[in-house]
Amino acid sequence: MNFIEAALLIQGSACVYSKKVEYLYSLVYQALDFISGKRRAKQLSLVQEDGSNRAVNSGTPCETEDEFLSLDDFPDSRANVDLKNDQASSELLIIPLLPMALVAPDEVEKSSNPLYSCQGEVLASRKDFRMNTCTPDPRGSFMLDPVGMCPVEPVDVHPMPRSQKDAEEAEEQPMAVSRNGSPVSVRSISQEPDGPALSSGDEDAEDVAELPEVALEPAEPRTSQQTAILPRRYMLRERQGAPEPASQPQETPDPWQSLDPFDSLDSKLFQKGKPYSVPPGVEEAPGQKRKRKGATKLQDFHQWYLDAYAEHPDGRRARRKGPSFADMEVLYWKHVKEQLETLQKLRRRKMTERWLPGAKQDLWPAEEERLEEPLEDLGVADDFLEAEEYVEESEGVMPREAAGLDAEAIPESLKYEELVRRNVELFIATSQKFIQETELSQRIRDWEDTIQPLLQEQEQHVPFDIHTYGDQLVSRFPQLNEWCPFAELVAGQPAFEVCRSMLASLQLANDYTVEITQQPGLEAAVDTMSLRLLTHQRAHMRFQTYAAPSMAQP
């Protein structure tokens, strides 16, 4: 890369960025000047206002300048109402439902009241042209009627007609007389949207005092109708009584709510329980001597089951396989399995004592403890499985050699070790059928069969010594400085010997003992390597006899 061009490029980019920084710097200063100028203009306007006020006070005329109205100089008006979500109606809550004016009528309602044209054609339904009815809100806005009734009107038990209600409100509305003699309606206290709904008697007195003075002057002679209406004009509308606070429903405690461990519970009165007398066999008298009780023997499940569930008058059950209750299935088969194992051990012991009379008696201590139990519980009088069935099953489980043992087949000099060895071999032979060979185990076995011969062959090879193989390769050269193909030097040798000779030749070339070259025609033949012997002296031998010049004696 040309460094001059690179330097010019860097200089140009630096100039561009410096101009950008200067432009941003000027923008910042312009913004600061604009802010300071606006502040100075505001100060000048304040000074001019002070000067104009002084001029007015002094009586000197000053020129009036046209000023624009600000956007927020409108007076507060009752027509503008800000609705807030947290302001709720004090009388009734508006149900947040879809207004009835926006609910589409059904097809049945449309067909029941159709709208016909002059020619008798059905144009539409009268239900399609429904007026949106609105209800004035206490805050001054108009709300759509959600359920067809005014949400701010109190719910009366006997609603009166609309016309009658309007008439009464017109009568209760106070009137006042203006300067020109025309009646003017005076707003009542209840019409104030922001004022409280209830007030005290002092406020009523103040409202009466605030009435115009014209109404307090002596009235002129009027007709009987006017005199009847006149006293009603000064009456204020009766205020409704304070509504009784609705009794809040008692909250029922949640039984699933977790209790507070640190909360103090209500104290409950102690209730005396019902006493029970202790049986004399259980009660311990203070003067009696306590005797150590032995361990109680558990009742035999088999005998208990027969006593509890036997349903025969003579006390014997029919031959049935398994209990009659599903709950006893597990216990039943567990008991049967234990009996079967005990009978098998008993039969095996009898056979051993028959052929080995001199065997030791303490070979099966656990079995002797089990055999101490009565034989009636082991299957002699068993109602579930008879003794003959145990014998048949045990004969099927015993090995075939042991089942067919006779006096002629087994010699008298048969020892216990020989019998155990035969049983173990028989067990191994019979357990082979339970071995399941998977696909992965088959692949592993094939790989082992393939790799085992190779490993054995590698173990038979002599250790690899690179100097020994180098000496053998040098000895095969006919003379110095003569090119010989590598294939001729290793002709007739196995593959692993060729690999070792190849590695030894590379070491010789590194020591400058031989020279390696390649003949043209690599694409035609793979073996194009040739070697030439340079010297018979080996490098490692030279290093052994090497002496540095500094070590030589002068």
UniProtKB/Swiss-Prot annotation:
GO molecular function, one example?
chromatin binding
Protein's GO biological process? female meiosis chromosome separation; female meiotic nuclear division; meiotic chromosome condensation; mitotic chromosome condensation; mitotic sister chromatid separation; positive regulation of chromosome segregation; positive regulation of chromosome separation; T cell differentiation in thymus
- Comp. bias (Acidic residues): 201-210
Phosphoserine is found on 45, 178, 182, 199-200, 441
Ranges for the region named Disordered are: 154-296
According to its UniProt record, where is this protein located? Nucleus
UniProt entry keywords in alphabetical sequence: DNA condensation, Nucleus, Phosphoprotein
One Gene Ontology CC term in the entry: nucleus
Pfam families on file: CNDH2_C (PF16858), CNDH2_M (PF16869), CNDH2_N (PF06278)
- Please note every region of biased composition (Polar residues): 179-191
Q: Which family does it belong to?
A: Belongs to the CND2 H2 (condensin-2 subunit 2) family.
Briefly state the protein's biological role: Regulatory subunit of the condensin-2 complex, a complex that seems to provide chromosomes with an additional level of organization and rigidity and in establishing mitotic chromosome architecture. May promote the resolution of double-strand DNA catenanes (intertwines) between sister chromatids. Condensin-mediated compaction likely increases tension in catenated sister chromatids, providing directionality for type II topoisomerase-mediated strand exchanges toward chromatid decatenation. Required for decatenation of chromatin bridges at anaphase.
PANTHER family with a match to the protein in the record: CONDENSIN-2 COMPLEX SUBUNIT H2 (PTHR14324:SF3)
Summarize the subunit comment. Component of the condensin-2 complex, which contains the SMC2 and SMC4 heterodimer, and three non SMC subunits, NCAPG2, NCAPH2 and NCAPD3 that probably regulate the complex.
The name this protein carries in UniProt is Condensin-2 complex subunit H2
Q: Which organism is it from?
A: Rattus norvegicus (Rat)
